[in-house]
Amino acid sequence: MDKRTTQFLKSRFQSYYKNAEIGLPDHLPNREWAFIFYDDMPEKMMHRHKSFGSPGEALDYLYGMAPAHVYNSTAYYEYPDAKKMNEKNWLGAELIFDLDADHLPNAPRNYADMLELVKKEALKLLDFLLDDFGFSEQEIQLVFSGGRGYHFHIVSPKVLTLGSSERREIVNYVSGRDLEFKYFFREVAMDGDFGTGSKTFKGMKNVPMKCTLVGYDSGWGRRIALYLTDYMKRESEKKYKKDMFPELRRHEKVGDTTIKKLINIANSETGLKDILEKGRLDFDVRNFKEIAAYFMQESAEDFLHRFGASVDEPVTADIKRLIRVPGSLHGGSGMLVKKLALSELEEFDPLNDAVVFGERPVKITASKPFSVQLKGKDLRIEEGIQEVPEYAAVYLICRGVAEYGHRRNQPDTV
């Protein structure tokens, strides 16, 4: 990045910070801040161990310095500006989740598709935070990172003193790592109107057994119920019976009789509903506990891909992590690190809603062809000199595929 390009970006960032609404963290004097400046480019040197005593001091600093990247600590310190970490005196830390397309298997290369995929992961994580862990919406802060993902901040007092190992356990839970499916299926003595009959068999030596799904109405049990019912419905709708339930047919105790019963349950008015609302899995099928556990184990990869949340474990486990400040700009994209209400996530479009610069034409020199979708437009950039809207110029320069202005002896692109 040449000097003129650096000055252009710094001036654009400074114009933004003049009136920016920055999401300053609570307990501001107890937070460490860190910055990467355009004046250090192309080196990405982090300047850290800084603290601010008041909101005005922090905002004045951002406007005056116009940094490329802005971070604050997720931890609270007694002495946040101490130069050595062991001298800061750690007091606690928010619980942080980082979802980034870089950590998703088979993430698409197209930026818009990539962002859509990571949003789905964010929605799955949000379900865990609200349903499984019971955090209130007020305890969850959601932020678009300005790049390829989302950050979740849990600010509940219940999590502040959790250590790294406890935080890793939380990651293991939301990802479904080491999930033991056999413990979700249980055989119990049939009693009353729950299983295949309505009689009570208490006191009998040989009591009929029924298979039930443990925890069918919440947590992983609910997700297993959804997966099973979706599978049964999908398979029963196939045209030919011989093509139905191929995964179950591989089990030695599953024959045509069992398949027929499963089809009947899937096609009945109450069969699938009873799984979701009662955890009922007896179906008058012998060995169904064993069969169901086998199916879930065989389908584990697909099940966890659908329901597990892929989060960056090192970020969550790090109790002294630096994270981007909401309301700041991401120096790798020029986009806004945007705080969102939880209700906004599903409809949020980063390539429109996190773009802060305007339409003013800016001349750039692109080093290679490049395409991107911004503000509802498909922008196709050719190598060479051309004019683009300011928001596109900032994005392309931040991505490292263009310089500001034009070079001598460089032909304009028509």
Curated annotation (Swiss-Prot):
Names of the cofactor(s): Mg(2+); Mn(2+)
Active-site annotation: 98, 100, 312
Keyword rRNA processing: no
Manganese keyword on record: yes
Domain of life where this protein originates: Archaea
GO molecular function, one term: metal ion binding
Family indicated by similarity: Belongs to the eukaryotic-type primase small subunit family.
The protein's name: DNA primase small subunit PriS
Organism: Methanosarcina acetivorans (strain ATCC 35395 / DSM 2834 / JCM 12185 / C2A)
Pfam families: DNA_primase_S
Keyword annotations from UniProtKB, A to Z: DNA replication, DNA-directed RNA polymerase, Magnesium, Manganese, Metal-binding, Nucleotidyltransferase, Primosome, Transcription, Transferase
